[in-house]
Amino acid sequence: MAKTLYEKLFDAHVVYEAENETPLLYIDRHLVHEVTSPQAFDGLRAHGRPVRQPGKTFATMDHNVSTQTKDINACGEMARIQMQELIKNCKEFGVELYDLNHPYQGIVHVMGPEQGVTLPGMTIVCGDSHTATHGAFGALAFGIGTSEVEHVLATQTLKQGRAKTMKIEVQGKAAPGITAKDIVLAIIGKTGSAGGTGHVVEFCGEAIRDLSMEGRMTLCNMAIEMGAKAGLVAPDETTFNYVKGRLHAPKGKDFDDAVAYWKTLQTDEGATFDTVVTLQAEEIAPQVTWGTNPGQVISVNDNIPDPASFADPVERASAEKALAYMGLKPGIPLTEVAIDKVFIGSCTNSRIEDLRAAAEIAKGRKVAPGVQALVVPGSGPVKAQAEAEGLDKIFIEAGFEWRLPGCSMCLAMNNDRLNPGERCASTSNRNFEGRQGRGGRTHLVSPAMAAAAAVTGHFADIRNIK
């Protein structure tokens, strides 16, 4: 029987399945951070259980680390306690930890792929909703809750029901300057923020194959923002070339054998999906969200929509509420909307290619008066690479702040946050009310678009910036 990529990955990991019971899946990799793990380790301790597979468990600090200092006390008492607990727990249970002073420390979904922890064909979990990022490698990756974190630590397995399948095909080639962020925002604009609920999404089509691994990670990172359980891109030569030579990747003949298997991780011809969505890449312009969920998104050259134009009463009410919160009026061109802050970072867009794209816009320009712009690399290796290329100097000369790695203003768990009423052009993944700070207003954009907003003081079409 013809199978989708998701079905192949799921079936290959079923440990046990009884009639009328939820299947038990084997978990290949478990990524851990300081926020969702303390109670899980406490549970192990209370029952006298070890970590079943410490060699398949990797930890880092990211959510509430300071991006201005490596001082563990810098972001308040709760942050300090969570980080100290992670140090204690990893030491006690034999888990490898990339702490504040480790050169590999960074956002968990940046660290995993760049260290070769993430490989095609794997099941990967983390107590974090954006674990879907790792699906870019053709791995089944999804977020779990703290009780499930404990279960995986104890057993290296997890009960998981089968999801429905969705194919999202982006046909043709994207125009110059159009990034994975624009593509995924356009997709969510079409499906809505709940369009993928109950599904695992496979992204395919020429525009997807053209993306680098970093672009594919951006794409899969935001699968969760359309309500999907996970996002997938089938592995190909782009994937294999990225993985080869990384710290935890197979070496020599083992790598060749792995690639031979990874090449089978494609959806079979004739396999059926529960839902199919198609977009034309050439129709996608730079995207900017205007509301309070990622599905409320338009092209940069469009006007803010009028809630009255929505036929669905629920959508209309949502749009009215969003515009009130965002302090926007219908009919205003997006390019006339001024911004206060810019955040370039997060597990969506903090990799080296993202920083290069932003630096290209920043080079030779200055951050607009009254705008604060932060650049937060996703990990120690990304920061080191950017500095080796001189990107930090470009940003600093333009008036951007060059920070240490961490999740930062994406979710405002450290000291990087918006004040009430402040408007931010952000490369992160969520524009919910209060996400970047109480009363803060978030617009999601690509790194180049964020840099353009920083230097112009308002949203600007990067296609017009020479």
UniProtKB/Swiss-Prot annotation:
[4Fe-4S] cluster binds at C347, C407, C410. SUPFAM superfamilies: Aconitase iron-sulfur domain. Heterodimer of LeuC and LeuD. This is 3-isopropylmalate dehydratase large subunit. NCBIfam families: leuC (TIGR00170), PRK05478.1 (NF004016), PRK12466.1 (NF009116). Its cofactor is [4Fe-4S] cluster. Keywords: 4Fe-4S, Amino-acid biosynthesis, Branched-chain amino acid biosynthesis, Iron, Iron-sulfur, Leucine biosynthesis, Lyase, Metal-binding. PANTHER family: 3-ISOPROPYLMALATE DEHYDRATASE, HOMOACONITASE, MITOCHONDRIAL-RELATED.
